[in-house]
Protein backbone atom coordinates (compact mmCIF):
# COMPACT_ATOMS: atom_id res chain seq x y z
CA UNK A 1 0.00 0.00 0.00
CA UNK A 2 1.38 3.41 -0.93
CA UNK A 3 1.48 6.31 1.51
CA UNK A 4 -1.38 7.92 -0.41
CA UNK A 5 -3.78 5.24 0.83
CA UNK A 6 -2.55 4.94 4.43
CA UNK A 7 -5.63 6.75 5.72
CA UNK A 8 -8.04 4.68 3.61
CA UNK A 9 -9.70 1.37 4.40
CA UNK A 10 -9.49 -0.94 1.38
CA UNK A 11 -12.72 -2.88 0.94
CA UNK A 12 -13.37 -5.64 -1.58
CA UNK A 13 -16.54 -5.65 -3.66
CA UNK A 14 -17.71 -8.78 -1.85
CA UNK A 15 -17.28 -7.19 1.57
CA UNK A 16 -18.78 -3.87 0.49
CA UNK A 17 -21.97 -5.44 -0.86
CA UNK A 18 -22.51 -7.19 2.48
CA UNK A 19 -22.58 -3.85 4.33
CA UNK A 20 -26.13 -3.11 3.22
CA UNK A 21 -29.19 -5.34 3.39
CA UNK A 22 -30.27 -6.65 0.02
CA UNK A 23 -33.10 -4.63 -1.49
CA UNK A 24 -34.54 -4.24 -4.95
CA UNK A 25 -32.87 -1.38 -6.86
CA UNK A 26 -35.30 1.59 -7.02
CA UNK A 27 -34.96 1.92 -10.80
CA UNK A 28 -35.58 -0.20 -13.87
CA UNK A 29 -33.15 -1.62 -16.41
CA UNK A 30 -34.50 0.91 -18.93
CA UNK A 31 -33.88 3.83 -16.58
CA UNK A 32 -30.35 2.62 -15.90
CA UNK A 33 -29.69 2.31 -19.62
CA UNK A 34 -30.93 5.86 -20.20
CA UNK A 35 -28.60 7.49 -17.67
CA UNK A 36 -25.34 5.70 -18.41
CA UNK A 37 -22.75 7.33 -20.64
CA UNK A 38 -22.94 5.69 -24.05
CA UNK A 39 -19.55 4.00 -23.76
CA UNK A 40 -19.97 3.02 -20.10
CA UNK A 41 -21.15 -0.31 -18.72
CA UNK A 42 -23.25 -0.74 -15.59
CA UNK A 43 -25.85 -3.26 -14.45
CA UNK A 44 -28.59 -3.49 -11.85
CA UNK A 45 -26.26 -5.87 -10.01
CA UNK A 46 -23.75 -2.99 -9.74
CA UNK A 47 -26.52 -0.81 -8.32
CA UNK A 48 -27.31 -3.45 -5.68
CA UNK A 49 -23.71 -4.34 -4.84
CA UNK A 50 -22.06 -0.91 -4.95
CA UNK A 51 -24.41 2.03 -5.15
CA UNK A 52 -27.10 1.08 -2.62
CA UNK A 53 -24.45 0.64 0.12
CA UNK A 54 -22.95 3.95 -1.04
CA UNK A 55 -26.33 5.69 -0.74
CA UNK A 56 -26.65 4.23 2.76
CA UNK A 57 -23.21 5.60 3.67
CA UNK A 58 -24.21 9.04 2.36
CA UNK A 59 -27.30 8.81 4.57
CA UNK A 60 -25.02 8.29 7.59
CA UNK A 61 -22.89 11.31 6.65
CA UNK A 62 -26.00 13.45 6.13
CA UNK A 63 -27.44 12.48 9.50
CA UNK A 64 -24.11 13.26 11.16
CA UNK A 65 -24.00 16.68 9.49
CA UNK A 66 -27.53 17.48 10.66
CA UNK A 67 -26.74 16.38 14.22
CA UNK A 68 -23.65 18.59 14.28
CA UNK A 69 -25.58 21.57 12.88
CA UNK A 70 -28.25 21.09 15.56
CA UNK A 71 -25.62 20.92 18.33
CA UNK A 72 -23.87 24.02 16.99
CA UNK A 73 -27.21 25.82 17.03
CA UNK A 74 -27.66 24.97 20.70
CA UNK A 75 -24.12 26.13 21.46
CA UNK A 76 -24.63 29.42 19.59
CA UNK A 77 -28.16 29.79 21.00
CA UNK A 78 -29.74 30.20 17.62
CA UNK A 79 -31.69 28.09 15.19
CA UNK A 80 -29.49 26.34 12.62
CA UNK A 81 -30.34 27.02 8.97
CA UNK A 82 -30.97 24.11 6.65
CA UNK A 83 -28.25 23.66 4.02
CA UNK A 84 -28.00 21.33 1.03
CA UNK A 85 -25.81 18.26 1.32
CA UNK A 86 -23.18 18.79 -1.37
CA UNK A 87 -21.42 15.82 -2.98
CA UNK A 88 -18.32 16.19 -5.17
CA UNK A 89 -17.57 13.55 -7.83
CA UNK A 90 -14.18 13.58 -9.55
CA UNK A 91 -12.00 11.40 -11.75
CA UNK A 92 -10.43 11.31 -15.20
CA UNK A 93 -12.07 12.08 -18.49
CA UNK A 94 -13.98 8.97 -19.73
CA UNK A 95 -13.79 7.12 -16.40
CA UNK A 96 -17.54 7.14 -15.77
CA UNK A 97 -18.10 10.15 -13.48
CA UNK A 98 -21.28 11.19 -15.26
CA UNK A 99 -22.87 7.75 -14.96
CA UNK A 100 -22.03 7.62 -11.25
CA UNK A 101 -23.44 11.11 -10.71
CA UNK A 102 -26.68 10.54 -12.62
CA UNK A 103 -27.23 7.22 -10.85
CA UNK A 104 -26.69 8.84 -7.45
CA UNK A 105 -29.17 11.56 -8.39
CA UNK A 106 -31.86 8.93 -8.94
CA UNK A 107 -30.97 6.81 -5.91
CA UNK A 108 -30.87 9.75 -3.50
CA UNK A 109 -34.16 11.15 -4.78
CA UNK A 110 -35.80 7.76 -4.19
CA UNK A 111 -33.95 6.72 -1.03
CA UNK A 112 -34.78 9.92 0.84
CA UNK A 113 -38.53 10.59 0.88
CA UNK A 114 -39.45 13.69 -1.15
CA UNK A 115 -35.76 14.65 -1.48
CA UNK A 116 -34.77 17.07 -4.25
CA UNK A 117 -31.44 16.43 -5.97
CA UNK A 118 -29.66 18.80 -8.36
CA UNK A 119 -26.78 17.70 -10.61
CA UNK A 120 -24.18 20.14 -11.91
CA UNK A 121 -21.10 19.52 -14.05
CA UNK A 122 -18.15 21.90 -13.85
CA UNK A 123 -17.91 21.93 -17.66
CA UNK A 124 -20.22 24.94 -17.47
CA UNK A 125 -17.45 26.86 -15.72
CA UNK A 126 -14.97 26.44 -18.58
CA UNK A 127 -14.15 29.74 -20.21
CA UNK A 128 -15.76 30.07 -23.67
CA UNK A 129 -13.47 29.06 -26.54
CA UNK A 130 -13.14 32.68 -27.65
CA UNK A 131 -11.80 33.65 -24.22
CA UNK A 132 -9.35 30.74 -24.29
CA UNK A 133 -8.18 31.82 -27.76
CA UNK A 134 -7.69 35.40 -26.60
CA UNK A 135 -5.66 34.17 -23.63
CA UNK A 136 -3.65 31.82 -25.86
CA UNK A 137 -4.63 28.71 -23.88
CA UNK A 138 -7.13 26.91 -26.12
CA UNK A 139 -4.67 24.00 -26.21
CA UNK A 140 -4.90 23.91 -22.41
CA UNK A 141 -8.66 23.39 -22.35
CA UNK A 142 -9.55 21.16 -19.42
CA UNK A 143 -6.45 22.18 -17.45
CA UNK A 144 -6.96 24.23 -14.24
CA UNK A 145 -6.34 27.61 -15.88
CA UNK A 146 -9.15 27.05 -18.41
CA UNK A 147 -11.83 27.17 -15.71
CA UNK A 148 -13.41 30.24 -14.15
CA UNK A 149 -12.70 29.02 -10.63
CA UNK A 150 -13.90 32.25 -9.03
CA UNK A 151 -17.32 31.74 -10.63
CA UNK A 152 -17.35 28.10 -9.48
CA UNK A 153 -16.53 29.08 -5.90
CA UNK A 154 -19.19 31.80 -5.98
CA UNK A 155 -21.73 29.25 -7.24
CA UNK A 156 -20.88 26.81 -4.44
CA UNK A 157 -21.11 29.56 -1.83
CA UNK A 158 -24.55 30.64 -3.01
CA UNK A 159 -25.81 27.05 -3.25
CA UNK A 160 -24.47 26.30 0.24
CA UNK A 161 -26.55 29.21 1.51
CA UNK A 162 -29.72 27.90 -0.09
CA UNK A 163 -29.93 30.26 -3.05
CA UNK A 164 -31.13 29.46 -6.56
CA UNK A 165 -28.39 30.00 -9.16
CA UNK A 166 -28.28 30.14 -12.97
CA UNK A 167 -25.06 28.78 -14.47
CA UNK A 168 -23.66 28.46 -18.03
CA UNK A 169 -24.25 25.31 -20.08
CA UNK A 170 -21.47 23.46 -21.92
CA UNK A 171 -22.08 21.30 -24.99
CA UNK A 172 -19.70 18.46 -25.84
CA UNK A 173 -21.23 18.35 -29.31
CA UNK A 174 -20.19 21.93 -30.16
CA UNK A 175 -17.18 21.79 -27.80
CA UNK A 176 -18.06 25.17 -26.24
CA UNK A 177 -20.25 27.08 -23.82
CA UNK A 178 -23.72 27.53 -25.33
CA UNK A 179 -24.45 31.30 -25.63
CA UNK A 180 -27.58 32.55 -23.85
CA UNK A 181 -28.37 29.10 -22.42
CA UNK A 182 -28.44 28.62 -18.64
CA UNK A 183 -29.05 25.80 -16.20
CA UNK A 184 -31.26 26.86 -13.31
CA UNK A 185 -30.00 25.18 -10.15
CA UNK A 186 -32.61 25.31 -7.41
CA UNK A 187 -32.06 25.13 -3.68
CA UNK A 188 -32.21 21.39 -3.01
CA UNK A 189 -31.68 18.75 -0.36
CA UNK A 190 -28.72 17.36 -2.31
CA UNK A 191 -26.45 18.97 -4.89
CA UNK A 192 -24.05 16.73 -6.83
CA UNK A 193 -21.11 18.58 -8.41
CA UNK A 194 -19.26 16.50 -10.99
CA UNK A 195 -16.04 17.33 -12.82
CA UNK A 196 -12.36 16.59 -13.27
CA UNK A 197 -11.42 19.65 -11.23
CA UNK A 198 -13.69 19.52 -8.18
CA UNK A 199 -10.90 18.55 -5.75
CA UNK A 200 -8.34 20.99 -7.14
CA UNK A 201 -7.20 24.12 -5.34
CA UNK A 202 -7.98 27.44 -7.01
CA UNK A 203 -5.26 30.04 -7.43
CA UNK A 204 -6.74 31.79 -4.40
CA UNK A 205 -5.71 29.05 -2.00
CA UNK A 206 -7.39 30.68 0.99
CA UNK A 207 -10.57 28.87 -0.02
CA UNK A 208 -10.78 25.32 -1.36
CA UNK A 209 -13.57 23.82 -3.44
CA UNK A 210 -13.55 20.79 -1.13
CA UNK A 211 -14.47 23.09 1.78
CA UNK A 212 -17.99 23.13 0.37
CA UNK A 213 -18.38 19.36 0.09
CA UNK A 214 -20.10 17.21 2.70
CA UNK A 215 -19.13 14.02 0.87
CA UNK A 216 -16.79 13.28 -2.02
CA UNK A 217 -16.20 10.45 -4.47
CA UNK A 218 -13.28 9.75 -6.80
CA UNK A 219 -13.91 7.32 -9.67
CA UNK A 220 -10.61 5.56 -10.38
CA UNK A 221 -9.22 3.07 -12.91
CA UNK A 222 -5.95 1.99 -14.50
CA UNK A 223 -4.49 4.47 -16.98
CA UNK A 224 -4.48 1.97 -19.86
CA UNK A 225 -8.14 1.18 -19.25
CA UNK A 226 -9.13 4.85 -19.18
CA UNK A 227 -7.24 5.47 -22.43
CA UNK A 228 -9.09 2.59 -24.07
CA UNK A 229 -12.44 3.97 -22.86
CA UNK A 230 -11.55 7.46 -24.06
CA UNK A 231 -10.62 6.28 -27.56
CA UNK A 232 -13.77 4.18 -27.72
CA UNK A 233 -15.88 7.18 -26.70
CA UNK A 234 -14.17 9.41 -29.26
CA UNK A 235 -14.99 7.01 -32.09
CA UNK A 236 -18.57 6.62 -30.92
CA UNK A 237 -18.98 10.40 -30.87
CA UNK A 238 -17.96 10.33 -34.53
CA UNK A 239 -20.73 7.91 -35.37
CA UNK A 240 -23.24 10.26 -33.74
CA UNK A 241 -21.86 13.21 -35.71
CA UNK A 242 -22.12 11.59 -39.15
CA UNK A 243 -25.08 13.74 -40.21
CA UNK A 244 -24.55 16.73 -37.93
CA UNK A 245 -22.33 19.43 -39.49
CA UNK A 246 -22.74 21.55 -36.34
CA UNK A 247 -21.01 18.92 -34.21
CA UNK A 248 -17.38 19.46 -33.24
CA UNK A 249 -16.78 15.83 -34.26
CA UNK A 250 -18.27 16.16 -37.76
CA UNK A 251 -14.96 17.22 -39.33
CA UNK A 252 -13.38 13.96 -38.17
CA UNK A 253 -16.01 11.96 -40.05
CA UNK A 254 -14.42 13.23 -43.27
CA UNK A 255 -10.99 11.81 -42.35
CA UNK A 256 -9.60 8.27 -42.80
CA UNK A 257 -10.20 6.24 -39.65
CA UNK A 258 -6.45 5.69 -39.17
CA UNK A 259 -5.85 9.45 -39.02
CA UNK A 260 -8.74 9.87 -36.59
CA UNK A 261 -7.40 7.19 -34.27
CA UNK A 262 -3.92 8.73 -34.42
CA UNK A 263 -5.35 12.18 -33.62
CA UNK A 264 -7.42 10.87 -30.70
CA UNK A 265 -4.40 9.02 -29.29
CA UNK A 266 -2.31 12.20 -29.50
CA UNK A 267 -5.03 14.18 -27.71
CA UNK A 268 -5.06 11.55 -24.99
CA UNK A 269 -1.27 11.66 -24.54
CA UNK A 270 -0.76 15.43 -24.75
CA UNK A 271 -3.88 16.62 -22.92
CA UNK A 272 -5.94 14.07 -21.02
CA UNK A 273 -3.12 11.87 -19.71
CA UNK A 274 -1.02 14.89 -18.77
CA UNK A 275 -3.99 16.46 -17.01
CA UNK A 276 -4.75 13.21 -15.20
CA UNK A 277 -1.21 12.63 -13.97
CA UNK A 278 -0.40 16.23 -13.03
CA UNK A 279 -3.69 17.67 -11.78
CA UNK A 280 -6.50 15.12 -11.34
CA UNK A 281 -4.99 11.96 -9.83
CA UNK A 282 -2.93 13.91 -7.24
CA UNK A 283 -6.27 15.07 -5.74
CA UNK A 284 -7.57 11.51 -5.39
CA UNK A 285 -6.83 11.23 -1.68
CA UNK A 286 -9.06 14.22 -0.92
CA UNK A 287 -12.11 12.02 -1.54
CA UNK A 288 -14.04 10.27 1.21
CA UNK A 289 -14.59 7.27 -1.06
CA UNK A 290 -12.57 5.99 -4.03
CA UNK A 291 -14.39 3.65 -6.41
CA UNK A 292 -11.88 1.63 -8.43
CA UNK A 293 -13.05 0.17 -11.74
CA UNK A 294 -11.55 -2.85 -13.48
CA UNK A 295 -11.02 -3.27 -17.22
CA UNK A 296 -14.66 -4.26 -17.82
CA UNK A 297 -15.94 -1.14 -15.99
CA UNK A 298 -16.91 -3.19 -12.93
CA UNK A 299 -16.08 -1.66 -9.54
CA UNK A 300 -13.80 -4.19 -7.85
CA UNK A 301 -12.36 -2.21 -4.93
CA UNK A 302 -13.59 0.56 -2.68
CA UNK A 303 -11.39 2.78 -0.53
CA UNK A 304 -13.09 4.49 2.42
CA UNK A 305 -11.29 7.24 4.31
CA UNK A 306 -10.63 6.20 7.91
Curated annotation (Swiss-Prot):
Single GO MF annotation: pantothenate kinase activity
Localization (cell): Cytoplasm
Pathway(s) where this gene product acts: Cofactor biosynthesis; coenzyme A biosynthesis; CoA from (R)-pantothenate: step 1/5
Residues binding ATP: 91-98
Pfam families linked: PRK (PF00485)
Key words, A-Z: ATP-binding, Coenzyme A biosynthesis, Cytoplasm, Kinase, Nucleotide-binding, Transferase
CDD domains per UniProt: PanK
Reactions performed catalytically: (R)-pantothenate + ATP = (R)-4'-phosphopantothenate + ADP + H(+)
Biological process terms in GO annotation: coenzyme A biosynthetic process
Assigned GO CC terms: cytoplasm
Database matches in InterPro entries: P-loop_NTPase (IPR027417), PanK (IPR004566), PRK/URK (IPR006083)
Coiled-coil residue spans: none
Enzyme Commission number(s) of this protein: 2.7.1.33
Domain of life: Bacteria
Family: Belongs to the prokaryotic pantothenate kinase family.
Protein name: Pantothenate kinase
Record organism: Streptococcus pneumoniae serotype 4 (strain ATCC BAA-334 / TIGR4)
Encoding gene, per UniProt annotation: coaA
Amino acid sequence: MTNEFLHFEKISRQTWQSLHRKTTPPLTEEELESIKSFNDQISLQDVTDIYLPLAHLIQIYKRTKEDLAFSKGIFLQRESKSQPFIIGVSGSVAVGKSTTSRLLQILLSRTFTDATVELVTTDGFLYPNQTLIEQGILNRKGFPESYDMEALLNFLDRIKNGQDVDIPVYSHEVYDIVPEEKQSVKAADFVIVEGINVFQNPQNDRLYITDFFDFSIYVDAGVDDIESWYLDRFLKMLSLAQNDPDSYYYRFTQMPIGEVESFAHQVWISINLTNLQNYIEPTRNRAEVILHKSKNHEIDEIYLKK
